[in-house]
């Protein structure tokens, strides 16, 4: 078998090199431009050990326990952005304690956001009059189910909201939303 001399082996020409360089540059710029778009569609995950989502206030700022407790009195139920971006009530249980559970503010009847009525000490849906007690248990229809729960934890002063998979303490049943 004869071997081809090294001078006869075709090399990469200038045109092929420039085409490869242009393709690589355009691909790099396109991927760089698409990265923020891809991140927009992927839900954020928190670094919390519970695998939850970092709670955010109405401006999108991360909620810290010390900041929240300094501006919300005991017994307060105020909204944060929780799982899947749903509004979730954080419950202040004491001068220095956020409750271990949060209440999803989406009505189980037609999906309206249910405001907390502190005077009546219950959640009252403005759409069709459903009412829920202070723990989110339905007490008056037409809503068929209690409000969903979420676990709330504090790690390094950051507040995390995660999926509720335990028994619903209000009914003693498996959670309907899990």
Curated annotation (Swiss-Prot):
Annotated residues for binding of [2Fe-2S] cluster: 107, 109, 125, 128
Ligase recorded as keyword: no
Enzyme class: translocase
The Rieske domain, residue ranges: 65-161
GO cellular component, one term: plasma membrane-derived thylakoid membrane
Domain of life: Bacteria
Keyword Nucleotide-binding: no
EC number in record: 7.1.1.6
Cofactor note (record): Binds 1 [2Fe-2S] cluster per subunit.
Residue ranges of the TM segments: 20-42
InterPro entries, sorted: Cyt_b6_f_Rieske, Rieske_2Fe-2S, Rieske_2Fe-2S_sf, Rieske_Fe-S_prot, Rieske_Fe-S_prot_C, TAT_signal
GO molecular function, one term: electron transporter, transferring electrons within cytochrome b6/f complex of photosystem II activity
GO BP: photosynthesis
Catalysed transformations (reactions): 2 oxidized [plastocyanin] + a plastoquinol + 2 H(+)(in) = 2 reduced [plastocyanin] + a plastoquinone + 4 H(+)(out)
Membrane topology: Single-pass membrane protein
Protein function: Component of the cytochrome b6-f complex, which mediates electron transfer between photosystem II (PSII) and photosystem I (PSI), cyclic electron flow around PSI, and state transitions.
Record-linked PANTHER family: CYTOCHROME B-C1 COMPLEX SUBUNIT RIESKE, MITOCHONDRIAL
Cross-referenced NCBIfam families: Cytb6fFeSPetC, PRK13474.1
Annotated protein name in UniProt: Cytochrome b6-f complex iron-sulfur subunit
Organism field: Synechococcus sp. (strain CC9902)
Gene that encodes the chain: petC
